[in-house]
């Protein structure tokens, strides 16, 4: 399953607020479709699937990528669910979003893909790069790059920068000091349900 490129509000109407996907809020709270208002009891599978879809759409990754992250999270010490969130939060496109360099994660991914971002002084165009403690993330020293990020920093997608990212806003540079703590994950998610969803699939 490839990365989603369709209407974003349709997704938020179905799954709820996804700050990484879009800033806009759905005007109608009921799910899309002819029977969006109908209330019916959902199965446990449907509930787990919905939580999994929240992660996919919020972080803008494909099913194949998410499966890889789940496998990697399992191999790490500690809670698989927490590890999974830390891995997703550590992606370069998400870090740029959390710093305010991009308006959303897709917007931040474009910044990275188009060569506007540097890591440790070198241009890096790999959005999935896993940022680690000690990395310096910055907007490239180029007028066009600075202008793009400047406008986004004035109106960041999220109000607060997580404490593991030390941002120097005037210089458009930041230092990564560790992993994102669970309480600073912006999306409302039950990661245990995601782990359960993949328990028999991966």
From Swiss-Prot:
SMART domains: Ribosomal_S4, S4. Residues 15-43 are annotated as: Disordered. Keywords: Ribonucleoprotein, Ribosomal protein, RNA-binding, rRNA-binding. GO terms for biological process: ribosomal small subunit biogenesis; translation. One of its GO terms (molecular function) is rRNA binding. It holds the Pfam family Ribosomal_S4. Residues 90-152 form the S4 RNA-binding domain. GO terms for cellular component: small ribosomal subunit. It comes from the Bacteria. InterPro entries: Ribosomal_uS4, Ribosomal_uS4_bac-type, Ribosomal_uS4_CS, Ribosomal_uS4_N, S4_RNA-bd, S4_RNA-bd_sf. Belongs to the universal ribosomal protein uS4 family. PANTHER family: 30S 40S RIBOSOMAL PROTEIN, SMALL RIBOSOMAL SUBUNIT PROTEIN US4M. NCBIfam families: PRK05327.1 (NF003717), rpsD_bact (TIGR01017). Part of the 30S ribosomal subunit. Contacts protein S5. The interaction surface between S4 and S5 is involved in control of translational fidelity. One of the primary rRNA binding proteins, it binds directly to 16S rRNA where it nucleates assembly of the body of the 30S subunit. This is Small ribosomal subunit protein uS4. It comes from Prochlorococcus marinus (strain SARG / CCMP1375 / SS120). The gene is rpsD.
């Amino acid at each position: 399953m490839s990365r989603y490129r369709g209407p974003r509000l349709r997704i938020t109407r179905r799954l709820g607020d996804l700050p990484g996907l879009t800033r806009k809020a759905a005007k109608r709270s009921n799910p899309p479709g002819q029977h969006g208002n109908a209330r019916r009891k959902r199965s446990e599978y449907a509930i787990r699937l919905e939580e999994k879809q929240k992660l996919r759409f919020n972080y803008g990754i494909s099913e194949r990528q998410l499966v890889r992250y789940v496998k990697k999270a399992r191999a790490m010490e500690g809670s698989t669910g927490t590890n999974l969130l830390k891995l997703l939060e550590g992606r370069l496109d998400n870090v740029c979003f959390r710093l305010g360099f991009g308006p959303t994660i897709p917007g931040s991914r474009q910044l990275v893909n188009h060569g506007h971002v540097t890591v440790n002084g070198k241009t890096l165009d790999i959005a999935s790069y896993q940022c680690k403690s000690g990395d310096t993330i910055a907007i490239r020293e180029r007028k066009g790059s600075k202008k793009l990020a400047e406008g986004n920093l004035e109106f960041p997608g999220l109000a607060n920068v997580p404490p593991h990212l030390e941002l120097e806003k005037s210089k458009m540079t930041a230092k990564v000091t560790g992993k994102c703590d669970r309480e600073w994950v912006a999306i409302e998610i039950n990661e245990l349900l995601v782990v359960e969803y993949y328990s028999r699939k991966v």
